[in-house]
């Protein structure tokens, strides 16, 4: 096996002529040492003394040899292994978990680096996996270093790391762009401190095979002398361009792999593997199935078989059978013959992978790469803030990375499934996520870092210092969400963080909406663990709750068993339990909460019974409930992350633990439902949509509209969704439609500010970053109580904001809007439906009551403006005058709807009840109650203004009134 290019002389470019034939790694190490005071260099005075860019072809050793040799600057390679290293570390970031783990293990096992011992001098640190020394060479995902830069001081970072190597720096993920922003700001701050700070400034090395050296050098303000180019590769790669493009790349990929296999039947197993890139798991599963069928044909022809290994991030995190097959030696692997069921040695592995195998990964037995040329990533469109997974042609830089998987240990072959002409037409570089996705969850981090550089402590858009700033429309949308969420406000000199914003900016992985929802949980006294669970479900589950189902035929009814596993005990014996729960909750988010509660119950049950192999039992439980085990584990991990985030900033993650929805009883259930829905509304109010009766569509503030139809609930008047999603309509023509990801119905649960849902107002000057012209602040759609909470409902002790205390707010009381506390036995049989009232949009109702027995066919009721009602079976037999009066007092501040029945058997009861509720005003029993004018007279005499929606029928009348 040849040496990596970095260890072979004669590959240097963009260096002085006398050094062109140097061994690249020696030249690089010498270049670095010349700028280190401990090796005779001068004290750094600019970024040029601490930033180096290395552009080197794939397979050149920049991910392996370079970090090791840089570490040897700090620790001599001849140092005895028993001597513990106590100096500063070298961190080498990787964009993916697979590469971080694999590189560390490979170096620790390599005979070329006897001084690098896994767990002692080399290791890895990722979110799910960690095996690292306290000090040494540490391979880590970019997110690990990003979190450290976010939470640690400059001096703490400098004390930990002497070198930061950002491998695959061309990747433009949000986290990597933010990490580079943090690094640049840190270096500048330490340089400004003079020699005291400059002596320990970490050295930053950016490496990539396809990096735009001009863009990055301009960003860091360094010259050409800080750029080292290493050209050439040890072994050649032959590209096999097709004559024509394919219109079915999955089928073509299978055919190409089978052709390679048959035509190279004499390949040595150590030089035979095939890697096929696919954009997503759906394609991976389909291609794996086709390859399995191909194995059947090979078995019939008595030819050697292929071992098919589907690899994605989930396989790596779980270290499943496919991942273990990837890491094992080919001689230790077996494949089952589909005809004889006997096991035999495979000729080669066919690795079908997503982009997790695109960078930094060396498979020493890999000889062929098949690339369909597609890439799938999240894209977000503004101002709708609608996003989805969009499949587009991969950029040339990504294709070069894929091609670079071969030719590392021996000559390789690259099979693109597109013509050379197509390759030449696609973009050279991938679009950064800050452009395609917008700032998203890192917006507040950008704000804080920008404020740090501003002398007046305000946020100005023009001062954002990133490789690429967010697009204007994305930035305007993010600003609006931060202001509406109470995290940003306009001060005397410009935009500033509020106290809530300061707390939210300390979160590492929470978006504006997620932070706002957590804060709302404290405002409204919700169980924060429920909030964390719901946010975790939204984060993990793509598009719809039914995507939690591990079944090709997904529908809402299949969720029933999973939802019922987590509902409160008092609801479990109800007839038609799932249908009634679905009607009662009218909420995908709460159903997701119950699904997780069921999973959590299973965990506790298995632990209490001390079962062996907990994961196996949980997997079987998920299979029984038709749930994806991997998704449930991800929700569990994400939930833990959110709770940890809250604890880190000093908030109690188990606030109101006793008020969890799953532990509610008949008296508290609907109140807790209303509390959680209020939190949804506070967090996602910009994603509220109202039903337009004329267009039969839901419309929002930004003019977008979409069709939504629940399987049971018909046209609720107001819904909220965490995010709008783009769903493919036609793959052939690349068409998408807008649809809500999760739906929470607000009717009857929450007072919705209708004015807030009007088309959004323009916000002039907000992008100008200041108010120098002293113009009056434009009106913003911000609910007044947000400001009150920021100013009066929080106070902090200490400068670190570690303690957050609530102050009661007398003007904001959570209304008890049900009959639960009046008649405890009724909720067991509560049935919810929707009744259209033409005047209801003029008032904000909480919860409205009617007798279920009076409506046998709700489909006959005219659908106009939806108001939520609670059906109470035989309510007239239970509701006393005292109960009626108590109910009226609960609902009085916001109006009340009476559904009045005229059956003679109940007439006297209702008259007396109504008379008592209205303050003992006399109601004449001899009136003709079938005329609206008579009712209008009664209510005017009582000091009320009645609104009637229609002429009463023979037995029914609907009345809306407000005092």
From Swiss-Prot:
Domain Helicase ATP-binding residues, every copy: 43-229
Broad EC category: hydrolase
InterPro entries: DEAD/DEAH_box_helicase_dom, DNA/RNA_helicase_DEAH_CS, Helicase_ATP-bd, Helicase_C-like, P-loop_NTPase, SAM-dependent_MTases_sf
UniProt membrane topology term: Single-pass membrane protein
Subcellular location(s) of the protein: Host membrane; Virion
Domain Helicase C-terminal: 253-459
EC numbers on record: 3.6.4.13
One of the record's GO cellular component terms: virion component
Pfam name, any one: DEAD
Alphabetized SMART domains for the sequence: DEXDc, HELICc
Keyword match Transmembrane: yes
Sequence motif DEAH box, location on chain: 167-170
Matches recorded under Gene3D superfamilies: P-loop containing nucleotide triphosphate hydrolases, Vaccinia Virus protein VP39
Main location: host cell
UniProt keyword terms in alphabetical order: ATP-binding, Helicase, Host membrane, Hydrolase, Membrane, Nucleotide-binding, Transmembrane, Transmembrane helix, Virion
Catalysis: reaction(s): ATP + H2O = ADP + phosphate + H(+)
Induction: Expressed in the late phase of the viral replicative cycle.
Binding-site list for ATP: 56-63
Keyword flag Zinc: no
GO molecular-function term, one example from the UniProt record: ATP hydrolysis activity
Protein name per the record: Putative RNA Helicase B962L
